[in-house]
């Protein structure tokens, strides 16, 4: 007999499993849900009081304020089901008392609560035994929590005891927060300062925690505190109960993940964390959204503290960093050999001039603190001082720089910047600054010093360097200053210095002129290149990396590339890229223009090449740029010139002779890559060939931005719209477009250049608006805006000066209307350093009048050296001038307020678009037609089919991508002659703003073998370059006849084969449509009309009554008609007429009216002649110009036209097209 163990009679047998399940659903769950509801009810009535002590708790847990808490204690959770039959022991209460006694060790509390995107953060800073060890706890209200003092990933072997202990600790801390709330409130009331400074001994830097200045905002934060503490505790209690129930039958088993327990979702500390020493002020921005009363003050504080706006983060996330492009650089930086090197991740124009943001890891590596002064080194040995700022969101090797650092150090995205700690900045006793004259508005010298320079630099402790530029915003104008001289206590000429309390700020007597001061003003930089980011990054990888860091390739075990070949159509920027790389890479550059190498003497051409390569190998790193390489490296197999063959052979030998990793690289450019000798295009010589394509819409917009950055544009100019209309334009074409727009602007205002000087100035003054006259003599680079609301907004906000809130300047609305009375102040014209008044005294003018007897062009100055020297001596004797005076006789300059009238408007760009064509398509007549849908009457169904086929793929391309479908490539329009097939093709091209290439069928055929096929290839190449483009083949039956016909015309067969190949080669990236028109569809090759080529076949039939009426309306819309003309009746009478026949009818009616008019004028003239002969003295001839005998087109003219009208299409011809249409429909069926 087997004896059973009866220690736990109910919970020991597996046969009672069904009972367990019933107890689980009908006993436990109702109990727990009831406990939770009671708990939520007490929380709503604020029964969870912070004065309740742990030692006052009684054993009846369902009647106390902590409902259900002790029911799930850590001890009982080891056996949760058995806990129902047991009670809480006294030992449990003693343990809780011991844990609460630990809270007495806290000496100070500082709570900071954040609420952003429905997420509550509870932050606690603990100070114990006067130490500055801060601990951080972040909790989320969406069932996510991170436990302070415990690792995030719980080991799988740990039991549920650790979970309950952790939960109890969290509840204790939440209660303690509530209990210490009174202390925090009293502490906040006693502190009147806006900031609390917390010093961390272990981190050696000071952190600022912005306090809320407003009492209302304090109350709001307290309410949020109470609200989210309640939510947080209820979530913890629910998680505890659900976690206990779910692990009831799985005691001791591991979770599948091995790290995460049931009911708790771990959040890594690095994923969402907050630190009080973080200078990122996004939390302040979120608080500002909740507190509308303090928006302005908080925003200013954010900017003064070097914080970044939300726009910076949006821009940073949109741009990102391409890992492929910076792969080599990151490997080099990760190696640890270059600790001072960093990559520029972003250039934020909202930052202060001297702020550079970097990661905590990089600061620790450089041994610098937040707010420390650093020395920054950029390209061409350019240096600048900056202030290091902390940004925890940045990666280790990336930094964010300001706009001033970009300009001073000549940096761009993903460029290398060197950062060094700088400890030798001496206190500045005096610093001399000078603004650039083209950036200052109409400000006096006193206002420039007191209102611009002093508020920004005085007592700012900003580091300065000689010859560095700083940018200050004042009244919506970005004023650029240059540091000319730094004087310290020890030296009169210091290179670096730091502004102190006793530093003096001096404004230079003479303002700087940009054209005189800046060196190499015509140098091309990467900023001047637009629309070619991908190509430029590839070229920089292959050129700058081998030149700057050859050890990277040596460490991998490969040789650096020796040559790069750029090819593309003329005007895309190949030469500009080469010049920019040579200018930016700090390398020697030898430029070889192809024809310069050629010489008539034997051996001299090869000797020139050898000398250049020898010099390049001596001065490394070096770039040899060969422009138009096709002129010296043609294919030797097709060349009959021995000189060209020798030059190509010498170039091959020299490129093979380049040693590995010797920092010499050959860069070549050509627009005919197929004409270069194939031996040059192999690996080891020109390793990589990079095509510089025609820019797309975004690229054209970027090019327009660079080309117009110095132009005075009217606010109505929309560069996005212009870029969208410039299909097929390259960089040179867009430069010409801007030039033509400027010329058109000048023509509008100075079309009277033949006037005398005095008349010219008076005429210009009359043409200027009165309100702009009153603005005075303003700088030439300024522009105006006609938007009164915008001007009023700027005027109101101009009283507030915010220097660190450096928002980007809108170049269209750069000038704020200044005070009109300011120009009348005598002080503004007494200053000898006023850069806008360059008038001479009367004595100098008299001397010049004696010397210069000839009248000169008033656009230029006739000053000689003596006059200029005397002008310098008499500069202090200037007289007051009214800016509205006439043209200065000495300088021959037009007053600035007149020049400000010359602003380029949208209509000027529209005129330039009409006269400019893409340079790649000038060999063919490529234009956007002017025919619109209104010019074509009727055919509404055909118009809709054309829109669906051509317009939809251009405007709704994303929908085709959504359904993974291709658009139709071609359309065949067939029908009787004169029904409007050509007009329809032109109208759809105008509707979608696409380039239109019209090809007459026979013009592609030539007598030379292979030239016809080459013409077809060239046609499609040009269309691809100008995409989106429509190629219209008119009379395609002359090209694409059926190939099995016995015509013995091999050339036509080859042409149609080439056309079929080109149509099949149209890819999705190049949007090209083929429209063909024919009146002989029966003789076309069947391969051309299959789906995938000419997909849609549209029959253009004779117009019906409604269409004929519409055609009459379209033709006669601008013709004066008499009342007796009935268009509807004429539409009925023209049964069987085509569109061309109706046009001919209307033209015949007009001819009849003109014939009648001439006849009546001749009769009147004869009558006047007879009257003159009869009455010689008294008769006066009337003005025949005002006499119009036939003012309108009447019914009788149309009746005469109907007598001579004829029908060009016979009914039997129409039957042929109808039968062909039925044949196609049967085939489709």
Curated annotation (Swiss-Prot):
Q: Which UniProt keywords apply?
A: ATP-binding, Cell cycle, Nucleotide-binding, Repeat
UniProt-annotated binding residues for ATP: 568-575, 975-982
Q: Which InterPro entries match?
A: AAA+_ATPase (IPR003593), AAA_ATPase_domain (IPR050168), AAA_lid_3 (IPR041569), Asp_de-COase-like_dom_sf (IPR009010), ATPase_AAA_core (IPR003959), ATPase_AAA_CS (IPR003960), CDC48_domain_2-like_sf (IPR029067), CDC4_N-term_subdom (IPR003338)
Q: Name one GO molecular function term.
A: ubiquitin binding
Q: Which PROSITE patterns match?
A: AAA (PS00674)
Specify whether Cell cycle is a keyword of the entry: yes
Its BP terms in the Gene Ontology are:
autophagosome maturation; mitotic spindle disassembly; proteasome-mediated ubiquitin-dependent protein catabolic process; regulation of cell cycle process; retrograde protein transport, ER to cytosol
- Which residue intervals make up region (Disordered)? 252-315, 814-837, 860-892
State the superkingdom: Eukaryota
Q: Which portions of the chain have biased composition (kind: Basic and acidic residues)? A: 268-281, 819-837, 882-892
Composition bias (Low complexity) maps to: 252-267, 282-314
Q: What Gene3D superfamilies does this protein map onto? A: 1.10.8.60, 2.40.40.20, 3.10.330.10, P-loop containing nucleotide triphosphate hydrolases (3.40.50.300)
GO annotations of cellular component type: apicoplast; cytosol; nucleus; VCP-NPL4-UFD1 AAA ATPase complex
Q: Which Pfam families match?
A: AAA, AAA_lid_3
The entry sums up its family as follows: Belongs to the AAA ATPase family.
Q: Entry's PANTHER family?
A: AAA-FAMILY ATPASE, NUCLEAR VALOSIN-CONTAINING PROTEIN-LIKE
Q: What protein name is recorded for this chain?
A: Putative cell division cycle ATPase
- The record lists the organism as Plasmodium falciparum (isolate 3D7)
């Amino acid at each position: 007999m087997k004896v059973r163990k009866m220690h736990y009679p109910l919970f020991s047998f597996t046969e009672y499993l069904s009972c367990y399940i019933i107890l689980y659903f009908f006993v436990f769950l109702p109990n727990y849900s009831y406990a939770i509801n009671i708990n939520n009810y007490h929380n709503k009535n604020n029964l969870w009081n912070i004065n309740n002590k742990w030692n006052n708790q009684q054993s009846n847990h369902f009647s106390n304020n902590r409902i259900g808490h002790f029911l799930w204690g850590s001890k009982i959770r080891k056996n949760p089901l058995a806990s129902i039959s047991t009670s809480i022991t006294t030992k449990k209460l003693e343990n809780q008392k011991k844990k609460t006694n630990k809270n007495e060790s806290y000496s100070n509390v500082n709570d900071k609560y954040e609420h952003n995107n429905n997420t509550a953060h509870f932050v606690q800073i603990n100070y114990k035994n006067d130490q500055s060890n801060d601990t951080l706890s972040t909790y989320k209200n969406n069932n996510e929590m991170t436990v302070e003092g415990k690792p995030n990933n719980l080991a799988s072997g740990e039991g549920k005891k650790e979970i309950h202990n952790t939960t109890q600790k969290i509840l204790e801390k939440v209660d303690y927060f509530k209990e210490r709330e009174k202390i925090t409130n009293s502490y906040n009331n006693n502190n009147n300062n806006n900031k609390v400074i917390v010093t961390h001994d272990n981190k050696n830097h000071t952190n600022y925690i912005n306090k809320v200045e407003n009492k209302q905002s304090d109350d709001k934060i307290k309410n949020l505190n109470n609200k989210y503490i309640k939510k947080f505790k209820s979530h913890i209690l629910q998680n505890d109960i659900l976690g206990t129930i779910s692990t009831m039958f799985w005691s001791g088993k591991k979770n599948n993940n091995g790290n995460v327990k049931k009911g708790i979702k771990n959040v890594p500390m690095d994923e969402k964390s907050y630190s009080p020493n973080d200078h990122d002020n996004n939390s302040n921005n979120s608080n500002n959204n909740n507190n509308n009363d303090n928006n302005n003050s908080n925003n200013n504080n954010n900017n003064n503290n070097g914080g970044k706006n939300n726009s910076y983060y949006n821009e940073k996330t949109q741009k990102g960093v391409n890992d492929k492009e910076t792969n080599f650089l990151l490997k080099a930086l990760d190696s640890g050999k270059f600790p001072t090197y960093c990559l520029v991740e972003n250039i934020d124009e909202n930052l202060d001039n001297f702020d550079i943001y970097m990661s905590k890891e990089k600061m620790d590596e450089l041994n610098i603190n937040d707010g420390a002064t650093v020395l920054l080194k950029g390209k061409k040995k350019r240096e600048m001082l900056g202030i290091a700022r902390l940004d925890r969101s940045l990666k280790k090797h990336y930094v964010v720089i300001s706009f001033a650092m970009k300009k001073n150090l000549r940096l761009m995205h993903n460029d290398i910047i060197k950062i060094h700690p700088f400890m030798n900045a001496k206190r500045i006793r005096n610093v001399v600054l000078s603004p650039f004259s083209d950036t200052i508005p109409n400000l006096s010298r006193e206002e420039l010093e007191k209102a611009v320079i002093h508020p920004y630099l005085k007592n700012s402790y900003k580091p300065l360097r000689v010859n560095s530029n700083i940018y200050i915003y004042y009244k919506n104008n970005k004023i650029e200053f240059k540091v000319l001289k730094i004087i310290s206590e020890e030296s009169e000429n210091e290179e670096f210095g730091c502004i102190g309390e006793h530093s003096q700020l001096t404004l230079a007597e003479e303002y700087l002129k940009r054209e005189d001061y800046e060196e190499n003003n015509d140098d091309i930089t990467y900023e001047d290149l637009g629309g070619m980011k991908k190509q430029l990054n590839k070229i920089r990888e292959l050129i700058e990396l081998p030149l700057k860091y050859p050890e990277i390739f040596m460490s991998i075990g490969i040789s650096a590339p020796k040559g790069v070949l750029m090819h593309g159509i003329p005007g895309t920027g190949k030469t500009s890229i080469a010049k920019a790389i040579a200018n930016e890479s700090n390398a020697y550059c030898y430029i070889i223009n192809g024809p310069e190498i050629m010489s008539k003497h034997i051996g001299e051409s090869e000797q020139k090449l050898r000398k250049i390569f020898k010099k390049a190998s001596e001065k490394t790193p070096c770039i040899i740029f060969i422009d138009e390489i096709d002129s010296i490296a043609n294919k030797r197999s097709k060349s009959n010139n021995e000189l060209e063959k020798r030059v190509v052979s010498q170039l091959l030998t020299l490129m093979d002779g380049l040693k590995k990793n010797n920092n010499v690289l050959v860069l070549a450019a050509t627009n005919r890559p197929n004409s270069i000798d194939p031996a040059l295009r192999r690996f080891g010589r020109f390793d990589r060939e990079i095509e510089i394509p025609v820019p797309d819409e975004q690229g054209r917009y970027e090019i327009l931005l660079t080309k117009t950055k110095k132009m005075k544009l009217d606010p109505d100019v929309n560069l996005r719209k212009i870029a969208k209309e410039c299909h097929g334009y390259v960089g040179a074409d867009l430069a010409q477009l801007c030039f033509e727009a400027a010329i058109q602007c000048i023509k509008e205002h100075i079309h009277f250049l033949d006037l005398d000087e005095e008349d010219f100035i008076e005429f210009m003054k009359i043409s200027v608006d009165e309100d702009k006259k009153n603005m005075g003599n303003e700088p030439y680079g300024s522009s105006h805006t006609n938007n009164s609301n915008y001007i009023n907004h700027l005027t109101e906000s101009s009283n507030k000066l915010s220097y660190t809130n450096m928002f980007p300047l809108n170049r269209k609305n750069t000038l704020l209307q200044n005070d009109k009375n300011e120009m009348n102040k005598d002080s503004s014209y007494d200053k000898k350093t006023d850069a806008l008044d360059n008038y001479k005294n009367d004595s100098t003018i008299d001397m010049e009048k004696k010397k210069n007897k000839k009248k000169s062009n008033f656009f230029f100055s006739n000053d000689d050296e003596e006059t200029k020297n005397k002008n310098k001596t008499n500069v202090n004797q200037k007289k007051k001038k009214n800016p509205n005076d006439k043209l200065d006789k000495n300088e021959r300059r037009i007053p600035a307020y007149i020049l400000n009238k010359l602003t380029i408007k949208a209509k000027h760009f529209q005129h330039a678009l009409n006269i400019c064509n893409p340079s790649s398509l000038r060999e063919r007549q490529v234009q956007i037609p002017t025919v619109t849908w209104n010019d074509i009457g009727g055919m509404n169904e055909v118009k809709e089919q054309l829109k669906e086929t051509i317009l939809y793929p251009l405007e709704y391309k994303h929908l085709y991508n959504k359904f993974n479908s291709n658009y139709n490539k071609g359309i065949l329009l067939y029908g009787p002659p004169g029904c409007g097939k050509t007009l329809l093709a032109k109208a759809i091209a105008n509707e979608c703003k696409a380039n239109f290439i019209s090809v007459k069928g026979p013009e592609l055929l030539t007598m030379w073998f292979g030239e016809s096929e080459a013409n077809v290839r060239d046609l499609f190449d040009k269309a691809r370059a100008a995409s989106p483009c429509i190629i219209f083949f008119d009379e395609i039956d002359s090209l694409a006849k059926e190939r099995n016909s016995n015509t013995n015309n091999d050339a036509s067969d080859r042409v149609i084969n080439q056309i079929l190949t080109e149509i099949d080669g149209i890819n999705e990236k190049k949007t090209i449509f083929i429209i063909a028109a024919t009146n002989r569809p029966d003789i076309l090759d069947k391969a051309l009309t299959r789906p995938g080529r000419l997909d849609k076949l549209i029959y253009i039939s004779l117009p019906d009554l409604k269409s004929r009426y519409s055609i009459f309306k379209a033709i006669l819309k601008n013709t004066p008609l008499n009342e007796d003309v009935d268009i509807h009746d004429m539409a009925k009478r023209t049964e069987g007429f085509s569109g061309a026949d109706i046009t001919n009818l209307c033209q015949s009616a007009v001819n009849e009216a003109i014939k009648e008019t001439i006849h009546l004028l001749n009769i009147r003239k004869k009558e006047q002649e007879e009257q003159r002969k009869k009455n010689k003295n008294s008769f006066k001839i009337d003005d025949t110009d005002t006499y119009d005998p036939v003012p309108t087109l009447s019914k009788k003219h149309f009746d005469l036209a109907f007598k001579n009208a004829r029908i060009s299409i016979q009914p039997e011809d129409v039957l042929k097209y109808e039968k062909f249409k039925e044949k196609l429909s049967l085939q489709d069926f």
